[in-house]
Amino acid sequence: MTPEDLSTLLDEANHHPWESVKAALSKVDGQPHPRIGWLTTHLTETKRTYWTLVAEVTGILPPPGDAGLTRLMAWEVEAARKLPPESLTSLIHYEGTPFTVASLLRLSARHTTWHAGQIAALAGRVRIA
């Protein structure tokens, strides 16, 4: 995969109008299920961790520390696009497992889509306090 391919993959997981975090969150109405808050925080923290590791081995700037999920999703699409192609094979260790930059970013896209599905499933559950 090229940096452009990875950028597109992340953009689709984050922003596609039908199946993405953005699409799932657009279905949330009223008082959201508390698990949705946990999932969005988890996605934010995980994306920040992945990209901090990528920054350490590629020399790119790390993600903005004050970015919430929406801003971080837009940031990572552009960051992936700007990666030098040769950096995609750089090795990263995450949770004791070796990944290349490219494989870690593919993991990030899968992880994002997985949790987008959970958010979508919870979006229709209205909480009455």
Predicted regions and their residues:
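Aromatic-glycine hotspot motif
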Residues: 1-129
